[in-house]
């Protein structure tokens, strides 16, 4: 016999943030590698209409054998697997049958009001954004003195249609901004629409992003 009333919370969209404790140890080597890619102008050439004043490398960043790159890849993979375990409630036995498959990885360097329009990551399950250099990201006044979000990542609600009457006020926030912090990794469901707001600062905004799926061992 069911005890009524009951409540079921469904279709949650979880965004996780992790701090890389080895950030300072690898920061300079990673930045040098990113700017070396930029100087050689090996750009992705993908969705250029959605980007402005933004360098995007080719999608093979984690294939480099540099120790700093491989250390960051390991950190991202371990963080991703902890997300998979937490969000699904899997036990250690089942987790031992799974492994992360980072399909694409790339660097972004942004300044001079550079931005990336709203988009999703298709055909993958989880996305990651690692803040290598956050610069002056955060709330800042624009040229007209109006406060705006500078270089934040904005995530949009996947719930597209509802009536915003008094009963639905818990859904009133249709977007949330995450302010970059050096050495922080954000992991999010790839179906979430997200963007990078325009950024300007004395230092470039530098991030490493990736797409992934979770595979099961044979």
What spans do the regions from the language model cover?
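Non-heme Fe(II)/2-oxoglutarate
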Residues: 2-90, 94, 115
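Catalytic core of non-heme Fe(II) oxygenases with the double-stranded beta-helix
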Residues: 101-185
